[in-house]
């Protein structure tokens, strides 16, 4: 397979091997050398930190003032109960915040299925054990669930007056629906090329999103973030404004103003030399080739030019000037 040096090989095969509803292995190939790690690292970071999800950020437990309290009839410490609440896998539809309640009497095991849910909220792991109640145990609590991204420590969360109330226990929140991501890059071969990459991504979700959808969302986020570079337009530097070059006014005067002899003046006009600027650009050799113009006339011309600080065989930039009309030149022919 021969490619132009400027062309890049693009992946033409993607395989999603679903181990179960929450685990999958995604294989992408072939990739140019180095792109396996480039894409793998970027997708891994996005999967772990940028996908939206729901998590419990606050709990109010009846009879509990702080997380170091104990609740009569509950076998676990309050800290253990809060830790178990972090394992809830919650999906919310068309809502960013919701309050859930749990009211259960012992004896028995407390699971996520005991939480009362509104119609637009689901818990995908209802079998999750939250705690155990004894014969006289009674657990009544209210949970605050919000949508977010990544990991949010409780101590960095902005609080208002209500959330600072005694008895409102704050939890660190892990919003990401992806719990584990690992990738590896293997060698791949296409025809005679053996320097290619094969990217393998293994991921596990909490069940609120299937692995294939998680990969799709991560790739979409990456595409949206870098698409701005595709349309990046280089800002063209403004062209420098050229200052109008000033021409010595003497050069714009007609050769008649040199007050040469009639013979010399007529010889110059015969060669279409009408302005002093035309004259100073001629060399002695060129002028001596002019019919009827001898060395005496040449000496006269050189002396007159010297009296004005000029000489023959000068090099003038941008001559004739743009504002010197062609009509002006020909107007002297009739003189």
Curated annotation (Swiss-Prot):
One Pfam family cited in the UniProt record for this chain: RNA_pol_A_bac
Chain intervals for the UniProt region annotation (Alpha N-terminal domain (alpha-NTD)): 1-233
Catalytic activity entry: RNA(n) + a ribonucleoside 5'-triphosphate = RNA(n+1) + diphosphate
Stretches the record annotates as Alpha C-terminal domain (alpha-CTD): 247-335
GO function term, MF aspect, one: DNA binding
GO BP term, pick one: DNA-templated transcription
Gene3D superfamilies, per database record: 5' to 3' exonuclease, C-terminal subdomain, DNA-directed RNA polymerase, insert domain, RNA polymerase, RBP11-like subunit
Record-linked InterPro entries: DNA-dir_RNA_pol_insert, DNA-dir_RNA_pol_RpoA/D/Rpb3, DNA-dir_RpoA, RBP11-like, RNAP_asu_C, RNApol_insert_sf
GO CC annotation, single: DNA-directed RNA polymerase complex
Keywords assigned: DNA-directed RNA polymerase, Nucleotidyltransferase, Transcription, Transferase
The protein's Enzyme Commission number: 2.7.7.6
Domain of life according to the entry: Bacteria
Record keyword Cell division present: no
Annotated domain remarks: The N-terminal domain is essential for RNAP assembly and basal transcription, whereas the C-terminal domain is involved in interaction with transcriptional regulators and with upstream promoter elements.
Family: Belongs to the RNA polymerase alpha chain family.
Subunit structure: Homodimer. The RNAP catalytic core consists of 2 alpha, 1 beta, 1 beta' and 1 omega subunit. When a sigma factor is associated with the core the holoenzyme is formed, which can initiate transcription.
Role this protein plays: DNA-dependent RNA polymerase catalyzes the transcription of DNA into RNA using the four ribonucleoside triphosphates as substrates.
Official protein name in the record: DNA-directed RNA polymerase subunit alpha
Source organism: Psychrobacter sp. (strain PRwf-1)
Lineage: Bacteria, Pseudomonadati, Pseudomonadota, Gammaproteobacteria, Moraxellales
């Amino acid at each position: 397979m021969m490619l132009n040096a400027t062309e890049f090989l693009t992946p033409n095969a993607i395989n999603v091997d679903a181990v179960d509803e929450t685990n999958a292995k995604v294989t992408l190939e072939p990739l140019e050398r180095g792109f396996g790690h480039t894409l793998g690292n970027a997708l891994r970071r996005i999967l772990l930190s940028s996908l939206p999800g729901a998590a419990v950020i606050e709990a109010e437990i009846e009879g509990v003032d702080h997380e170091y309290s104990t609740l009569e009839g509950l076998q676990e410490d309050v800290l253990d109960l809060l830790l178990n609440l972090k394992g809830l896998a919650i999906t919310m539809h068309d809502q960013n915040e919701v309050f859930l309640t749990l009211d259960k009497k012992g004896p028995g095991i407390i699971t996520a299925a005991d939480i009362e849910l509104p119609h637009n909220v689901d818990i995908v792991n209802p079998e999750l054990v939250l705690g155990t109640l004894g014969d006289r145990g009674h657990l009544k609590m209210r949970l605050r669930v919000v949508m977010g991204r990544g990991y949010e420590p409780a101590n960095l969360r902005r609080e208002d007056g209500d959330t600072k109330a005694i008895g409102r226990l704050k939890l660190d929140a892990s919003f990401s629906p992806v719990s584990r991501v690992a990738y590896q890059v293997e060698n791949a071969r296409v025809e005679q090329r053996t320097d290619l990459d094969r990217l393998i991504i293994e991921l596990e979700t909490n069940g609120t999103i299937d692995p294939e959808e998680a990969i799709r969302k991560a790739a979409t986020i990456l595409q949206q973030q870098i698409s701005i570079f595709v349309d990046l337009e280089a800002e063209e530097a403004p062209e420098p404004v050229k200052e109008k070059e000033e021409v010595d006014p003497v050069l714009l005067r007609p050769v008649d103003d040199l007050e040469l002899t009639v013979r010399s003046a007529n010889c110059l006009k015969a060669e279409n030399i009408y302005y002093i600027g035309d004259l100073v650009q001629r060399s002695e050799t060129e002028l001596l080739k002019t019919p009827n113009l001898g060395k005496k006339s040449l000496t006269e011309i050189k002396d007159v030019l010297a009296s004005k600080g000029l000489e023959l065989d000068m090099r003038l930039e941008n001559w004739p000037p743009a504002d010197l009309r062609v009509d002006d030149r020909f107007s002297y022919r009739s003189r």
